Amino acid sequence: MAQHAVYFPDAFLTQMREAMPSTLSFDEFISACQRPLRRSIRINTLKISVADFLALIAPYGWSLTPIPWCHEGFWIERDDEEALPLGSTAEHLSGLFYIQEASSMLPVAALFADDNHPQRVMDMAAAPGSKTTQIAARMGNRGAILANEFSASRVKVLHANISRCGIANTALTHFDGRVFGAALPEMFDAILLDAPCSGEGVVRKDPDALKNWSPESNLDIAATQRELLDSAFHALRPGGTLVYSTCTLNRQENEAVCLWLKETYADAVEFLPLGDLFPDADRALTPEGFLHVFPQIYDCEGFFVARLRKMSSLPAMPAPGYKVGAFPFTPLKGREALHVTQAANAVGLLWDENLHLWQREKEVWLFPAEIESLIGKVRFSRLGIKLAESHNKGYRWQHEATIALACPTHAHAFELSVQEAEEWYRGRDIYPQTPPAADDVLVTFQHQPLGLAKRIGSRIKNSYPRELVRDGKLFTGNS
């Protein structure tokens, strides 16, 4: 594999020599950093099983190598990458997989280790959504996830990925993560803090990642990380699990941050060793039981993962000073709720008791029940999924609800051909040889919902959101 020129500050190399265990080769570290990163994907098991996905893409000639710490994760090699980018494939557009770096699958694997089944989870720094969607898949779209993102510009990307993957159990917030310990004390069964960091592990993806690197900036970042971890630990319930991770390699932002928490709260913090997380995990194991993944160990990005348990309750932080404001939604109950449910079921939209109906003017939403106790404590950017807008003739069902809730075996489902699916993704109406019988049509391809549409005469009127419409090649040549 070709090498690329990576910029290494001298002080960084000195720091890495000190941080790297004697069992690892520094020359191999430099060599690994200069190799381009292997592409990897994670199959979205909310939509398709691993076995069914592998059978589906078998004719394409894709070469998939299992990632040892993620059953649904694979390194991928494709001959047609230039002709058809991975993100433009039909399987990606319909949410069957997520393009995710292999090492970034580690934190969620650690969060759910030892058969852990949390019901309310926070992803404190969630964008662009790889780990939130991975958490949702591990939870089977049940319970609730609070996905927070401090960067306003990245919240939109986070929502787009959650929607594409058919996730219904998530609430989005836009806060500095340091507020949650005070705002939501001991409210979560599990928390993932994939902390902002100096990014030393990503040089294989970005050769200039260290252009602005300095030892001083590492210390500044570590100070912020301690405050975020402190907040996360206060938001975690006693007995709950917290995973702290970064994509950097220095000890100040990794081991030292976790040891600071232990020194601060002593017996309230228990480190949970990760040496048995997957075969050969001990090759990256630190004396504390953390995983410090240098890129040459598993041929992936550099990464750090620590898992800990909160053993006892902590004194509350000072109450937050902000005002949340009036909540603009009201629960939908009784006859109204039954009417919406029956109308949705009639077009193939189904949900269970994990989701509750709420209303705001003409909008109908589904909120995860597990998040309702947080209402009034924080301000949400988006909560649950928008199910419909009501109008004189009934309901206008929303695209994100169709992707998350539609049953592809419903009587109104209409399976598109490859050519018809390509037309659908391009925003064009479909003229099938044999039109569907029903006026309300659940459009599917590869037995996955693409949208709800209306049959008008012999055509199916395209309802694919304009902002999602694609041009160019969309399908693998021999699909």
UniProtKB/Swiss-Prot annotation:
The active site is at C247. It comes from the Bacteria. This is Ribosomal RNA small subunit methyltransferase F. It is found in: Cytoplasm. Disulfide bonds: none annotated. It catalyses: cytidine(1407) in 16S rRNA + S-adenosyl-L-methionine = 5-methylcytidine(1407) in 16S rRNA + S-adenosyl-L-homocysteine + H(+). GO terms for biological process: rRNA base methylation. Belongs to the class I-like SAM-binding methyltransferase superfamily. RsmB/NOP family. GO terms for cellular component: cytoplasm. It comes from Salmonella newport (strain SL254). Gene3D superfamilies: 3.10.450.720, Vaccinia Virus protein VP39. Coiled coil: none annotated. S-adenosyl-L-methionine binds at A125, A126, A127, P128, G129, S130, K131, E149, D176, D194. Specifically methylates the cytosine at position 1407 (m5C1407) of 16S rRNA.
